[in-house]
């Protein structure tokens, strides 16, 4: 790259854009094989999360590591939110994409404790949300959520991505708290 009239401002803009492009290429979509047995199915997820239909937004978990988790949601045309959002052109609401990502993050945090059935997670904060593409009936959402820092005093900070195929459709940073049930 040769610059004819470089200056501080333009160099900064170029460096920011270059960093953004590099980051986007570093993030790889998780590999999902629908024929493989999941690590957690919908019944196991029900044991850990208090959410029920129509608000249980995670169908299965296909990978769990020390600081990451990969979950799946199959979006169908029978989802109740499509009745009003939008009848002629159904689009999954962004807030529900975030909620689904938070539920996957909750499963990651619960996976870090003994006897996870005795704990609950609560969504505290969300930052840097970006929606990049519409989610429509027939899409399979793949969630990858990773811890940004170790869990301290029951508080976890996470970064999550939602993929449809190889494309990132949503990303966010969020915080959750894990609390022992009474």
Language-model-detected regions and their locations in the chain:
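Hydrophobic residues positioned within well-ordered beta-strands of beta-sheet architectures
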Residues: 20, 71, 143-144, 158-160, ...
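Short aromatic-glycine motifs in intrinsically disordered, low-complexity regions
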Residues: 42-52, 118
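Hydrophobic beta-strand-centered segment that forms part of the acyl-chain substrate-binding groove
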Residues: 30-39, 105-144, 169, 176
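Active-site helix/loop of acyl-thioester processing domains in fatty-acid/polyketide metabolism
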Residues: 61, 92-116
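Hydrophobic beta-sheet segments that form the core/acyl-binding groove
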Residues: 1-4, 61, 126-165
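Catalytic strand-loop segment that frames the active site of acyl-thioester-processing enzymes
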Residues: 52-92
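Segments adjacent to and within acyl-thioester-processing domains across lipid
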Residues: 3-46, 169-182
């Amino acid at each position: 790259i040769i610059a004819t009239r470089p200056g501080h401002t333009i160099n900064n803009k170029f460096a920011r854009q270059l960093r953004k492009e590099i980051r986007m290429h570093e993030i790889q979509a998780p590999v999902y094989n629908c024929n493989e047995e999941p690590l957690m199915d919908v019944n196991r997820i029900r044991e850990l999360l208090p959410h029920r239909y129509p608000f249980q937004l995670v169908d299965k978990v296909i990978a769990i590591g020390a600081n990451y988790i990969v979950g799946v949601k199959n979006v169908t045309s029978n989802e109740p939110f499509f009745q009003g959002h939008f009848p002629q052109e159904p689009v999954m609401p962004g807030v529900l994409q975030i909620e689904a990502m938070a539920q996957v993050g909750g499963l990651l945090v619960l996976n870090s404790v003994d006897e996870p059935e005795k704990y609950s997670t609560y969504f505290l904060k969300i930052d840097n949300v970006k929606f990049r593409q519409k989610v429509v009936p027939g899409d399979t959402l793949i969630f990858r959520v990773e811890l940004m820092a170790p869990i301290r005093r029951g508080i976890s900070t996470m970064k999550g991505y939602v993929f449809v195929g190889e494309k990132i459709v949503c990303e966010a940073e969020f915080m959750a708290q894990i609390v022992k049930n009474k």
